[in-house]
Every structure is written in C-alpha cells, then in structure tokens.
Amino acid sequence: MSQFWGEFPEAVINTFQRLQIALIGDIKKCPLSSPLFPELSKLDAHSQHHLLASFELPRFGGVTPGVMEQLHDAESELAEARARLLRERLHAVANKENIPYLGDCMYYDAPGINQEELLQAAFLEAPTPEWESGRIRPLWPKDDWFRDAKQGPYPEDYGDIPLGDFDNLYRAFDALVEEHWMSVYSTTLNPFALLRCGSEFVEECVVSAGSLIPACMMTDHHLQPTGDRQADKEERQDYADSQDSIQSMGDFWKEFYSKDSGKKIPDSHKSRLANDPNKVGFTKSALFHKQPLAHSLAQTWANFRGTQDKADLVKVTMDMNIEKYTVRLPDAVRTTAGPLYIEWINLPRMSENSARKLAEAGWNNADICGVDLAVKSHIAVGTPVRVIISLVDGACSDMPTATMCAFEVNLAAQNNRSLNLPLLSLPFSRLLADLHDFQHRVKIACQFRDPEGFNVGTPMLSFSSLEFSELKQTAFERNSLLRDSWSEIEKRACHGGGRCVASQGIVQTWEKEVNPPLKEYAPLVLPPVPQPKRNFIDQQSGEVVRPLIQKSRSMRFKSPSDLWSRPSVDGGSTFTLSPSRGSLRCDNVPGCAYEVDPLHLLYYELVNVPKDTLGGTLLTRIDVRAKAATFDSAVWRQWVRDGCLKPKIKMRITAATSCFSGIVLGACLDAYRRIPATTKTDFTASLVTGLPNIVWATRDTSEIEWDIDLAAVCGHTFFALEDTFGYMDFLVYVLRGNEVTAVADWSIYVSFHVDWTQESMSATLIPTFVWPPEPADISYFKEVWGPYHFTLDGTEAKESFSLMPGMAIPRGAQTVRTFPRVLAAHFRSWTGKVRMSIQEVSSIFLTGTYMVGVSWNATADLTDITTRKHWIVKSGEVFELDLYCPYGENPTFTGLVNGIPYIIVHRLGGIIGPKDSVGTFGFMIHLHGLTGVYKNPTLHSGDRSVGSAWFRVTNILDDNLVFNIPGRIEDMVAVAGKYEVTNYANPTSMLFSVTGLHGGFIRLHITWCPNTSLGESKGTLKYMQYLYHTTTENFFGDQATRGIIDQNGFTVDLACGDFFGATRVGLKGEVERLGIYSSNAKSIAEIRVSFEILSMKFYGSTIRVK
C-alpha cells in the first residue's frame, strides 16, 4: 500500500480499493488472475485506479510503455497534490486552535503543542466552518434508496437530489474535492466507471470523501489565520499563488513547444541541432536574402540625393560576441522538488561606445535574428549528463514567455552546435536605460541534468557565439532581409552532408543507448516575485511617493539579481528595486520601517552594555549552534533534518544611535576558537582583524546587517547536532569605550537569520588556499587598525604605522599572526599601493581633516609630508597610497639595516568641537587591500621543493625512545622527563596554524647524529608508518631500520587528513602517523624533522595568538 494513502480515512481507502477492482472487471467473473494485475501490482493503489480510469482499459488489456510514461506523470501530480493538502490541513487546524501563522511553511508558533501533535491533528478530520454549510450540505442526498445502499446512519440535512440523478451527484462530488483534486478523482467517476461499478460504488465514494471536505475547500476564509498577525489580501494571494508555483520540466517543455511563436518564422523558438558541428552553421547568406543589385544602386543614389526612405534602410551585422566562455557547475538551489542546477550568463554585446556611435549615425533598432552557439564539453566521453541551454529575455519574469528559444544537448558528445532564432528587437538610444537593455537584456541559462558526483565549480562546458542582427532606422521593418522559414535557412546552413535535427527530437535518439536510464531534470520552482517599484518625487511637496503597483500572479522564476534592474533615466526621480528576501531596509525613503520574516530566525539574544563600559570589553560570546538547539526554531529543525548544510548567516545587530558617546562596537566569527575562552578584556582590532569581523561606531550607526557565508569563509559544511570541524562562535565586544557616561546600562539586540543554500554530501568544499603560493596571493592583505586618537588641545596630532605585511601583529606581550600576513611572509618583497580609508568614531560633534603620506622612518613631520606625494582626506573617503621607498620594493618583514616603511596620518584641519567637549578625537584605519602591483614578489627560495624545518628532538634521557609524528602539521610536545622538543617557525609551518583545516600529502625528511665518537656509537633507529591505528588493530605502511651513524637519514610520504579528507591542529581523529623507535637513544645527540609539501589544500582562515 502506497504511503500516499496513509493520510486518508480508512473509509476512503476501502472505497477506492473496491472501485479499483470493479474497474478491472466483475469480481465474480474476473478475480485477481487478470493479465493486467502483474503490471498493476508493481504500482501503488492510487496510481492503479487513476491509470484504469484515465485510460479506460476495457478488460484484460496490457499496459503499454506510453501508458506507463503517462502514469509516472500522474504520480508526480499526486505528490504535489499531497503536499498542498497537507499545508491546507495545517491551515485549518491552526485556524481552529487560534495559532498564529508564520508564513508559507509547515511550522506554526503553537505554545504547548509540538509539531508531531500538530501534524497528527492535521491528518484528522478538520471541522467544517459554519460559512461552508450553506454551500455544501444542500448538495448531499437524503433519499432512502441512497441510505439503504450504504447501510449506515447519515445526517438529516443532505438536501434533495432525485433518485438516479447522476449528473447532480457528480456535481456534488466536484464541489467536495475542489479544484486541485479534480485531476485525481474526476476521472474515476466517468461514464465508464458508472457503467462498470454501479451507483453504489459512486455514491459510496461521495460519502467517504466527505471527510476530505474541510481540508480541500481552502479559500481565503481558511488561509487567513486568526490572531494579531492577520495577513492582508495580497499576502494571502501570494500564498495561494505559491501553491501552484512548482512546474515540472515536462509541463514546461509541453507548454513551451506547443506555444505559437507569433513571429515571422514559424516555430522559431524550436532551435536546431547540428549532426556535425563542422558541416552546419549560420552565415549571412543562410539567414538573409541578398538585395538585388539594382535595388542597392537605387538606394545608393537616393541616399546621395537625400531622398532615401528610412524604412528601406537595413544593415546586416555579424559579431562574435563570445570567443570562449566556460560554464562551471553552480551550487544547487534548494527547492521543494529537489536540487536545481542552473547558471545564468549575460550574452555579451558590443561595447557602449559602439552602440552610441550607431545611435548617433541614425540606427534606432537592432533585430537579433540568429545566434549560432558552439558548445564544447569538458567531461569524459560517454558520461550521461545533459544540459538545457536557453536564450532568455531578461525583461520578462514568466519562464515560458521569457524563453525565446531553447535546446538540449548531450555532454557525452564532445562537440555540439545549435542554431537559434531569438527574433528580439532592441532599441538603440543615447539613454542609459536603453543601452543597459541592449547590453544586458539577453541571458543564456544553462540547466544541468543529473550532475551528481561532480564538484561545484567544475568546468562543465564552454561555448562560443556568433550573433547575426539587422540594424534599422525605423519601426516599419517593411524591408527585412531575414528569410521566412526554417527550411530555407537549413538548406543554406548545411553543407558537405550536414543536416539539422529539431532539438526536442534528438534527445530520444541518443537516450536509448544510455544505460541505466537518465534521471529527469529537477522541476523548476517558479515563486511569485514582486514587481520592481518605482518611486518618484512630488514636485510640490518634495516628498518621496511610492505608488501602489498591482502584483502579478504569473509564474515566476529565479534569476540573477540584475535581471530586472536598470539605471534610472527620469530626471530628479529615484529608483529602487524591491527589497530582496534578505534585505530589509529602504534607505532612500526617510523614516522607512521594515518587516522581519521570523521563519529564517535561528537564534537571538539581548546583550547588556554597562553605562560606563570600557574599551576592550567582551560583551558576549555566542555559540550559535548550541544556542539554536535550545531555541528550537523552524530553521534549526530544517538543519537537523538535512544534516550537513552550507549556511549563509545574516547577523543583525540593533542598538541605538548615540552621537555623543564615542563608543565603537565590533563583532567577529571565531570559527576555530583561537581566542581563549578566558579572554574577557583587552579586545583590540589587532586581535580580531585576522578573523571575519565587522566594526561600527554608534555615532552614526544604530543597526547593522552582516551577511557572512560560512561555507565560503570556512570552506566546509556545518552539522546541526554537534561541532565537527569548526564552531559557530560569534563574539561581540567594545573597541572604544564611553567618552561620556551613559544614563544607565543599555542593551543590544543580536539575532541570527539563516538561508540554507544546499545540503552537501562532502564535508570539505572549495578550499580557501591551494599550495603553492602565487604572486597574486599577497593582495589578500585586508585589516582594521585602531582605535587611535588625537588630543583635543593639539598636543598629539600625528600617528605613524609601520606596514610590514609579513610580520606578526604585536599585542602587548603577545603576537597575533593572521592568514593574509602569513601568506605575505612567503615573499621577500612587494610593490604597489595600499587602498585605505579613515573612519571617525568619536563624538559626532568632533570633526577634522587629515593628511596622509609615506615616510621611510617614523620621524617625518608635517613639513616632510607636504614635500612628498600625499593625500588630504576626510572620514569615509577611500584612497590609494603609493608606498614608494628608496629601494624600489618594500620588504615584507623587518629590515634591521635598510629601514621600515611607515604610513603617517597627520591632523590637518580641526579638531573642531563644542567648548565643553571631553575625551579625545578617535579614528579607525581600514586597509582594503594591496593594489597596483607592478612587480611580482619573489619567494624566499627559488625552488619550492626545499623542505621546511618542523622540529628537533634533543637531550634524550632514556635509551628507550618512542615518539609519534602525526599526519598534520602542528607544534610537537615532548614527553615529560624523556626528551626535549624545539619547534621551528617558518612561513610554511605557520600557514597550518592560521587556517582551519588542511588536507594533502607531505614528505618527511628525518636526520640524526650521534653524541659519541664514531667508534663508540652503537644501536639503531627504526621507524614504522601507521596507516590506521587503534588499541586493537593496526594497518602498517613503510618501515626501516637504520644505524645510529647514518649521514642521509630517510624520507617518508605521509597523508595529512582524516577519513573525510582533511584535519586541523588539535582535532581529535585517526590520521596517519609515523612512529620513531630506538633502544639506544642516549647515543643520539639530536633528531631533526623537516617536511616538504607535495600537495595541500587549506580551508578557512583564522589567527594564532602566541
């Protein structure tokens, strides 16, 4: 019995079981021995009766393949109807229990009622509202004949239906099961069923289906929840639209291929595929007629005399818009029907200058007539992966309408070529909006089918495009040169035995040879999308007016954010897109409030701030994963259900603007807990700048939204029920304290909202860094410095900062190493400019202007700076500072003799403020990266294969030496009383300490020397490689025994990483290791271990505090 039937009352199940048997034949004459039953028995009961009733198989006929294919489509419809029924029943239960509705989701805020109880209540018979009684109950029959047929009690208010009036009885059944159940049940009660089953079964169906009435009859009365959070009419309409927002690919193609093109060329939307890419292709002569010579001469003469009719002016162009574009496998979009792999690409056009010149020359329209696409596959021959490539009109949000032409290709073949006729006319104009349309309106969409097993970011295909267009000066178009039919075009596009095949027919040809059969595409999810709202300024009042725009109920599809965007061309008006799901603000409208959707809320917390708070104070450390488990929100349950996910978190912090306090707050993500839990004070920018962080001043900011993609930042997924590779620890702290004590303690509202992007079958995702370092890696250098201050009386008016990208950041008695600085430490020098800005953070009543310059020493004063290249800047202005030096290149680490480059910030104008101002004038410095590199930096060693020192073992006190080298690079710790270990620092080993995870292969170089004379030395040194190790079982790798006197030592390759492919410093788990043993260890003076990286991937950037 299908699971689908489990949600229906038993009476309905029994009814349709009997109905199904009756449809096959008389039970007495034809028991279950019919030849039809073996095939039907493979299907669920609901599909069986749907099959028999829909196709009216007479008696004992077999099930043909065509029928089976239609049956699978019917099963998909049943699954969609089941989901809709469940949502509607939940609405009914919530309405009855007065439970607030939280949006289009199966979760409700029901205090005292858990989700299991709520679902159970939804599957029970829901109450019939009073308003329904007048419409439904009069249709029920009450005749004795009907009552005797069922042999059971019935309500008295059935209404009047004459005996044997099957038409009214049929309409009553229609009213009961409503619109979306008609496709399932109406075919059951066709004339064939009535004749074969008799009236008893039909009437029994009507009575049994009565329990479905309350759940099925969902109108606006049901969809509107009770309580304080009443949905308005548009929101209820959006919900109703969303229930029909899933369109299967089969339905889409059926609608697309059956539509009338309404264009000059019939079936122009049906692209053509070439059987041989070298023998088929568009040319000007294939697409366009040639003008007669006499007509061309007449046009030339008329143009010379100035009597040329502009309606006759046509110019044919051919442009190679794309020489090569590589399409990589995108992240899947999570939908209710499965993952959707789709990549959107702008079809490049001519440059803006070229378009302007054509417009100035009088050409006003460009008709895109043909696009020739050559597709090159980048996957192995024979791999069963298909892709739908569509040319889409980006100005339309209805998928079947927006798709101008489409085709499907087999990537198992290395080369494919398609001929497409989009037939889209675009205007030439000097207006910015028209130019934007011309350059960005045409999109190419690539939807992959069954790409399982391929990693995100894998190059799947590349394509080149030729575009053929007609340029015209008017809209009359009476002299178009485009040919009139596909057949005429194909004759001239094919040569040397080439031929074209319709795109919808070629798939079945090669699909027959694929075993196992290919999976179907994921259905397109087409949610309703609000139209962009155009604001305008009232010329009399000067206020921003937001007109009401009727929402569209058409089917929508997801696409890039710039699909509908365009610059404003209306003078004096403002234009904004409708806020996206993650964006809340409408900053261009003064006093604009915003609504928060609680369905994405993972956790929130109120953080207390003391009224006399001091700089460096930690306000809170929030373990979001652990807190969310106790908070038990809807997105938490989704996380638990799906396992490993790649979350995008929006951290929303709401406080209040304080223009006088001078407080600077900050937040950071410590994904690997490198800041000790005991650290409660002394939080400075130097400590957190190497972590993902955000800084804001309360003088001008009361609320911030910090979007952070944890999968991109950390390079791995997160599991709901425990901490695996990293932590979701967010810290909130004070970087600069009060200038003026607040009136009382105050609070900050911190909330975390999650958008699950895709579940992942792999723990590690795209690495943050792949060995070896490249010259461009030094540009990763981005930091925040401060806070710094100038005194209000002018005694302190200069700050100087040394810029050594490869050095650790000093922090009192400690140092902090960051991932960008360790990367920079691999290079000896660097060149270029520093992109930076200054942010004022003190009281809003204090302002100033700064002069920023460069000095080769820290003693430069204002006079020295003004004689060199410098910048005069204000708060918030971004500029690029050229760090020129006497040697042409800047060192990345401290130069003991040559000097250090310094950035000098000098007060220039100000500081200006009220008489009673107190405190100091504070500011932060933001480094946005290194730009303008004019010479590639050089590595410390020209040969990257040279090993890096790891550690050495000395002062061995016991002859029996045993120590293990793990398959991860970390600081080695000595066994107390046995020997001493010295760890070495170098850029390569430090790289492992400032990243989250690492996985790859290293080669160990191990050498040793005796501490006695050669004649007295004796004993051996052995090693054993453990591939797998437990207390009861070992898998062994390489092994060897060497004498104490050995000049060469030995090398061993070791894998770094646990079973999931990576590991991290201090992570518990089973990794490969190398055991070192000796029974004559006192004879060894020292053992030295170096390593060489063969291949390595690093995931996530962090810091190391030492």
Curated annotation (Swiss-Prot):
Entry PTM = Specific enzymatic cleavages in vivo by the P1 encoded 3C-like protease yield mature proteins.
- Stored Gene3D superfamilies: 2.60.120.20
List where Basic and acidic residues composition bias occurs.
Answer: 224-239
Q: Which GO terms describe its cellular component?
A: host cell plasmodesma; viral capsid
One GO MF annotation is:
structural molecule activity
Keywords of this protein's UniProt record, alphabetized?
Capsid protein, Host cell junction, Transport, Viral movement protein, Virion
Q: Name one Pfam family in it.
A: Nepo_coat
GO biological process assignments: transport of virus in host, cell to cell
Region of interest: Disordered: 224-243
Question: Anything else the record notes?
Answer: Virions are comprised of 60 copies of the coat protein.
Homology family? Belongs to the nepoviruses RNA2 polyprotein family.
What's this protein's name? RNA2 polyprotein
Q: Which organism is it from?
A: Raspberry ringspot virus (strain cherry) (RpRSV)
- Cite the source lineage: Viruses, Riboviria, Orthornavirae, Pisuviricota, Pisoniviricetes
